[in-house]
Amino acid sequence: MAIADILLPTCNRPESLILTLSGVASQTVTDIHVIVSDQSAEPIGDLPVVQTLQRLIEARGGSVEWHYRVPSQGITEQRDFLLNRATADSVLYLDDDVFMEPWVLEQLLKTLHTEQCGFVGAFPTGLSFRNDVRPQQQIVEFWDGPVRPEVVNPGSPQWERWQLHRAANLYHVSQSLPPGEFRRYKVAWIASCILYDRAKLLEVGGFSFWSRLPRYHSGEEVLVQNLLMRRWGGCAIMPSGTYHAEVRSTVLNDAGTVDGHALDLLPEMVERYAPETVEVK
């Protein structure tokens, strides 16, 4: 069994997928199993550069499992499929538009194993915002002790933590850290690059709710992370060492929006998986 399974959903973004796989192939942790679920119009796995990167991952001690699956039933179904294929204790959900510096997976694994929390994220920076400094959005709450369970309700003051993940705010705050120092900070939710404790994720139902969402939706990781934080806590690392390709989203409908949000299911999911936190405000 690999140290970590990297779960990678992709759809019609060959250029950014190549960027993502390049980061995967350079990780200091090499005992990895990459599971790709491709729902592109044409299979991306047949591209020569993609095949070369797959061979590189394998040559360094990893393995790659590729699935071409059409038609698409939405991103949450993709995540559910990938989770059902996973066997490692730790699973990294990695979007197909994120580049990781070589140390990222190692640091995420170290943090998850130390904290024994539900998840640890590494939020990517869009470097087109590198010169767009927004001090009013750079409020950060660090975990100075162990990561603990917490309730972060939509609309609460803690929900505003998401502002740190706008533009390049996290990148700018990270510049104040001494070289080589990492900090854990509190989140409302985190997207794009998240290492989960697989057993804990399954204990809150994973992404099995996919059939209740319309084809074009969002918020599936917001939902599961909210449940995980209530029971075991969650955090993110700074610096993140991840960078966003800043390409067009593939989870939106033709109007450029979504037809539903998974967070609408939060009240009943809390009742089912974290009932002891229902009354916490």
Model-inferred region functions:
Residues 152-169, 175-196:
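A recurrent flexible, glycine/aromatic-enriched loop bordering the glycosyltransferase active site
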Residues 103-162:
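Conserved donor NDP-sugar-binding/catalytic core segment of glycosyltransferases
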Residues 19, 182-199, 203-281:
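C-terminal catalytic/acceptor-binding lobe
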Residues 13-26:
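Short, well-formed alpha-helical segments that are part of the catalytic scaffolds
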